[in-house]
Amino acid sequence: MATTTSHATNTWIKTKLSMPSSKEFGFASNSISLLKNQHNRQSLNINSSLQAPPILHFPKQSSNYQTPKNNTISHPKQENNNSSSSSTSKWNLVQKAAAMALDAVESALTKHELEHPLPKTADPRVQISGNFAPVPENPVCQSLPVTGKIPKCVQGVYVRNGANPLFEPTAGHHFFDGDGMVHAVQFKNGSASYACRFTETERLVQEKALGRPVFPKAIGELHGHSGIARLMLFYARGLFGLVDHSKGTGVANAGLVYFNNRLLAMSEDDLPYHVKVTPTGDLKTEGRFDFDGQLKSTMIAHPKLDPVSGELFALSYDVIQKPYLKYFRFSKNGEKSNDVEIPVEDPTMMHDFAITENFVVIPDQQVVFKMSEMIRGGSPVVYDKNKVSRFGILDKYAKDGSDLKWVEVPDCFCFHLWNAWEEAETDEIVVIGSCMTPPDSIFNECDEGLKSVLSEIRLNLKTGKSTRKSIIENPDEQVNLEAGMVNRNKLGRKTEYAYLAIAEPWPKVSGFAKVNLFTGEVEKFIYGDNKYGGEPLFLPRDPNSKEEDDGYILAFVHDEKEWKSELQIVNAMSLKLEATVKLPSRVPYGFHGTFINANDLANQA
């Protein structure tokens, strides 16, 4: 994909929107004001899921597809008249006729869907309300106001990914369906700048050129018979050369990792995208990145960077055909290993995993993909209550899966794993993760309240048995902990502390907790009255420091009363606020981030 020099904005949604309550997140709300495509939604019995097929196996692509050249967009309505006509003018008569017919079918399908109420997990009036709503791109703003003093060690750029739909949803939409947008705060000599840009995925480039969304939304739309119909529509558009799915369909909105001199934006439905930070602090998409032709499959959004070897470890899953799950690694120079097939009976939701000094720890849990459920009118993502969760343990440098050991961990679903390490004296691997109940609570509507319990899971390599306990033993101190990290210089090694978002009132984040993983002691930092944020990022003050918590926590925070956003920098040892950077525009709640130090920035590929 050619790098674009122009940028997109989305102006279809008003800036200041009220939030649904934590109890009713996902229930229909009239607080969001869409500027077009208003519909009276009445009923549609859709079960929502976190992930739909990350790999779609399409028939051969027509050679008639013309890559759009006009990627500029300032407003969707204008785009429909300008770059849309530029793109469609290259179509032949057959393509134009096919486009009209398929558009008519899609309009009828959407009208039918919107005659029924959307579930709260797929209703855009809920999923992207309040500060979950998208924002336009923001060019670099320099010399931002700072309260307090930025620590000297904070030199580089903090980047955070998130979902930010460019176009107004026309039907079902889950928050996770949005286009990827990276927010960046660069620090130079005590001064800070801010910018946010869309990651210019192949999907986004084509939709910008057409002036509307045409790619299926994995969570909000691909359910039941209507989901099958939308897939067939997309296949048909590909066969006629109206869209090109051969270069991926992903949104790159979840994870970020800096590896081998490249910042990679990731979601598990595609290859990573290379995003470059410019000297001024702006962001520029370099393109879809396949590691010089070595990576032929998707890669999950949470690869693990070993702090000692510099290697990157990753997984890839396929929901259609075997092998359903593969493991691979990259040397610190970016050389890929052969794939190792991980034998699993069903394609499994695989958002995260863990590494130790010598092993990889691979969860095979109860949330699975069953595409046949769409034929029955349901979601392809299923909570299989008859399945027993288990963790696979494999040597990091294994050439095949013959020595893979499985240890069952009943009734355990960890969406994220924060760390793992080996304890040789007991022949155990200790895994730290947040166990979520109900397992499908962020996928489907349910009456039971979500609980995310920070847990210690011990996998005994000798006996093949496991134990699991809550790290915070006092029930009065128990809080939902999701999104966070340990000191990444200690990843795969025994760590004393974890820094995790306090996901209360769900789904908002009121602060972060510093948890002693040995004693269960909890220290909390609350962002402030009417202030909510996201994932806390731990930045070590000195990589060689003997104190594990010697560093700072960085987090985007939004004031829902004043409707202003800021970046807070907190001393990780004392939990005292060191500095606040006032941001020029709103930063929506998002997903995961990383920090790139100044030396690495200077050496970007």
Curated annotation (Swiss-Prot):
It holds the Pfam family RPE65. Induction: Induced by drought. Accumulates in dehydration-treated fruits. Repressed after pollination. Inhibited by gibberellic acid (GA(3)) and auxin (4-Cl-IAA) treatments. Induced by abscisic acid (ABA). Up-regulated by salicylic acid (SA) in roots; this accumulation is repressed by salt stress (NaCl) with high SA treatment but with low SA. Regulated by the NAC transcription factor NAP2. GO terms for cellular component: chloroplast stroma. Residues 1-16 form a transit peptide. Its EC number is 1.13.11.51. GO terms for molecular function: 9-cis-epoxycarotenoid dioxygenase activity; carotenoid dioxygenase activity; metal ion binding. It catalyses: a 9-cis-epoxycarotenoid + O2 = a 12'-apo-carotenal + 2-cis,4-trans-xanthoxin; 9-cis-violaxanthin + O2 = (3S,5R,6S)-5,6-epoxy-3-hydroxy-5,6-dihydro-12'-apo-beta-caroten-12'-al + 2-cis,4-trans-xanthoxin; 9'-cis-neoxanthin + O2 = (3S,5R,6R)-3,5-dihydroxy-6,7-didehydro-5,6-dihydro-12'-apo-beta-caroten-12'-al + 2-cis,4-trans-xanthoxin. Binds 1 Fe(2+) ion per subunit. Pathway: Plant hormone biosynthesis; abscisate biosynthesis. The keyword Plastid applies. Expressed in developing and ripening fruits. Highly expressed in pulp. Observed in unpollinated ovaries (e.g. ovules, placenta and pericarp). Expressed in flowers. Disruption phenotype: The mutant notabilis (not) is abscisic acid (ABA)-deficient (including in response to dehydration) and exhibits a reduced growth and lower ethylene levels. Abnormal development of anther/pollen leading to serious pollen deterioration. Fruit-specific suppression leads to reduced ABA accumulation resulting in an increase in ethylene levels, by increasing the transcription of genes related to the synthesis of ethylene during ripening. InterPro entries: Carotenoid_Oase (IPR004294). Residues 80-89 have a biased composition (Low complexity). Fe cation binds at residues 302, 351, 416, 592. Interfering with NCED1 expression in fruits increases shelf life and reduces seed number, but increases viscosity of juices and modifies fruit texture. One of its GO terms (biological process) is response to gibberellin. Residues 60-75 have a biased composition (Polar residues). Belongs to the carotenoid oxygenase family. Has a 11,12(11',12') 9-cis epoxycarotenoid cleavage activity. Catalyzes the first step of abscisic-acid (ABA) biosynthesis from carotenoids. Required for ABA accumulation upon drought. Required for ABA-mediated regulation of anther/pollen development, including metabolism, cell wall modification and transcription level. Positive regulator of fruit ripening involved in the biosynthesis of abscisic acid (ABA); initiates ABA biosynthesis at the onset of fruit ripening. This is 9-cis-epoxycarotenoid dioxygenase NCED1, chloroplastic. It comes from Solanum lycopersicum. The gene is NCED1.
